[in-house]
Amino acid sequence: SEMCIRDRLNPIWYILNANMPEGMKEKEMIDLLLKRFIKDYDKTKNPEVRTRYGVFAGIVGIICNLILFLAKIIAGVLTASVSIMADAVNNLSDAGSSIVTLIGFKLAGKPADYEHPYGHGRIEYISGFIVSGAIIIMGFELLTTSFRKILHPTPLEVSVSSLIILVLSILMKMWMAKFNKYLGNKVDSAAMKATATDSLSDCVATSVVLIGVLLTLFSDINIDGIAGVVVAVFVILAGFGAAKDTLQPLLGQPPTKEFVQELENIVLQDKHIIGVHDLIVHNYGPGRVYASLHAEVPANMDMMEAHDYIDMAERRVEKRMKCFISIHMDPVVTDDEVINHLRKMTIAVVKSVGEELDIHDFRTVKGPYITNLIFDVLVPYNYHLSDDEIKKQIQKKITEKQSECRAVINIDKSYTG
């Protein structure tokens, strides 16, 4: 149908559907390049291999963008098109961004030292943010130039060679978007994903320039300045999107649900560990993840024996997930009927206040007249009740059920999203 043809000609549609069967040839070609130029290319968890990926992607980006810059600047001068020349300068900035990415990967691959005991992995995020900043600045420069062209339009001299250059540029940027997205997913690189976003915006931008040139060729309509504005807006939006993606790991974001589930499953694989909570994950760059959690063990277990089980759990996590972890041992009374009854009652009360709420670190302190139930309540972020309201409701309901009990509550937040 006409809609189907139009969709397939759309570069955004083409790139976003890179996982379709017809895109397999491109992936196979990229894998062949990786196999040819990157030693041990399949060992993507190895920091040295990740550095090789970054260097390779940077070199490819520099070469491709310099070729596009030279071709477009010639076409822009010949046609007197501000949008083509703006697109050329955009490619030159992309070449500079590739250099920044390359340097970032080299620095991020440096081993840990006295001043940086957690390594240099976050430099990769910083380089990605620099790339994003360069994209945004270039976008505003293009916007200024394009507005001037709208106010003071000049005639265009369209040639077949300029059209060919623009079409080939779109095709090359399509491939570069796929290339960087594929590599970024393989090694989980924010910098490469930012570069892929930039290439995608370049596809859209050059497509708009091409449409403007074609309109000039087949009619008297000159939308060169307007096309330049559209290009600039696409570039600016792409820059802000890439900046957001690279800032999130720097500011601190929760681990994925898959990561949390896998880690908890590995720890709970030992039947002597009966629960886990207070998981905190720190990301110091790809391949540099540090975690800590509290593991619950029966209080009547021998302390040295429990310590051995905790040590073995730490080694399992470090071996399988390449994650440095420190586990705190929490003793839990499991063989006292009174405490078990009070724990079940407390859980039921907390769930009646909010199904999303949960408890941990439950213990009791019995006095001559009052028994204190001491526990933490895990509350989601942006919960509809305030911390004080949650405490008051739980304390009131517990006292109503067990008049001799008082709830001593600590509100806790999840660090895993």
Question: What are the language-model segments listed below?
Answer:
Residues 1-5:
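Short, small-residue-biased leader/transition segments that mark boundaries at the very start
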Residues 14, 19-54, 245-417:
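Peripheral (non-transmembrane) domains and long loops of multi-pass membrane proteins
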Residues 12-268:
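Alpha-helical transmembrane cores and adjacent cytosolic helix/loop segments
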